[in-house]
From Swiss-Prot:
<dbReference type="Pfam" id="PF02268">
    <property type="entry name" value="TFIIA_gamma_N"/>
</dbReference>
<dbReference type="InterPro" id="IPR009083">
    <property type="entry name" value="TFIIA_a-hlx"/>
</dbReference>
<dbReference type="GO" id="GO:0051123">
    <property type="term" value="P:RNA polymerase II preinitiation complex assembly"/>
</dbReference>
<keyword id="KW-0539">Nucleus</keyword>
<dbReference type="InterPro" id="IPR003194">
    <property type="entry name" value="TFIIA_gsu"/>
</dbReference>
<comment type="subunit">
    <text>TFIIA is a heterodimer of the large unprocessed subunit 1 and a small subunit gamma. It was originally believed to be a heterotrimer of an alpha, a beta and a gamma subunit.</text>
</comment>
<keyword id="KW-0804">Transcription</keyword>
<dbReference type="GO" id="GO:0005672">
    <property type="term" value="C:transcription factor TFIIA complex"/>
</dbReference>
<dbReference type="InterPro" id="IPR015872">
    <property type="entry name" value="TFIIA_gsu_N"/>
</dbReference>
<comment type="function">
    <text>TFIIA is a component of the transcription machinery of RNA polymerase II and plays an important role in transcriptional activation. TFIIA in a complex with TBP mediates transcriptional activity.</text>
</comment>
<dbReference type="InterPro" id="IPR015871">
    <property type="entry name" value="TFIIA_gsu_C"/>
</dbReference>
<dbReference type="Pfam" id="PF02751">
    <property type="entry name" value="TFIIA_gamma_C"/>
</dbReference>
<dbReference type="GO" id="GO:0017025">
    <property type="term" value="F:TBP-class protein binding"/>
</dbReference>
<dbReference type="InterPro" id="IPR009088">
    <property type="entry name" value="TFIIA_b-brl"/>
</dbReference>
<protein>
    <recommendedName>
        <fullName>Transcription initiation factor IIA subunit 2</fullName>
    </recommendedName>
</protein>
<dbReference type="GO" id="GO:0016251">
    <property type="term" value="F:RNA polymerase II general transcription initiation factor activity"/>
</dbReference>
<keyword id="KW-0805">Transcription regulation</keyword>
Length: 113
């Protein structure tokens, strides 16, 4: 059985734009709802597959306070406050940040070198 893909990236600008476009197509009866769902599933699979290889930007951060954390279904969620963010070009501060970290290994890879 194939591992389900995280739907985390549907909340990105790209994911939201794709969803809105598909909703418009379904609303105009240009495509059926079932095709829209298949396209979003394909987006989930593709983005989860390609990002580990193509995304190379790194951001450093320092938070003054860890407000909450949770680990459920191989997903860590952290809520931190008073954060100083820095990358190679610029930096800034934010009052509150939610960090979601998903397990990057498939079930068969865990524990294997």
């Amino acid at each position: 059985m194939e591992k389900p893909n995280y739907q985390l990236y549907r909340n990105t600008t790209l994911g939201q734009a794709l969803q809105k476009t598909l909703d418009d197509f379904v609303g105009d009866q240009m495509i059926p709802d079932s095709l829209s769902k298949k396209i979003m599933d394909s987006f989930d699979k593709s983005i989860n597959k390609i990002l580990p290889h193509k995304a190379k930007n790194k951001v450093n951060f320092r938070a003054d306070k860890l407000r909450a954390y949770r680990y459920c279904d191989n997903v860590w969620t952290f809520i931190v406050e008073q954060i100083d963010l820095r990358d190679a070009v610029e930096g800034g501060t934010v009052d509150r940040l939610k960090i979601v970290a998903c397990d990057g290994q498939t079930k068969g890879q865990i524990g294997h070198a």
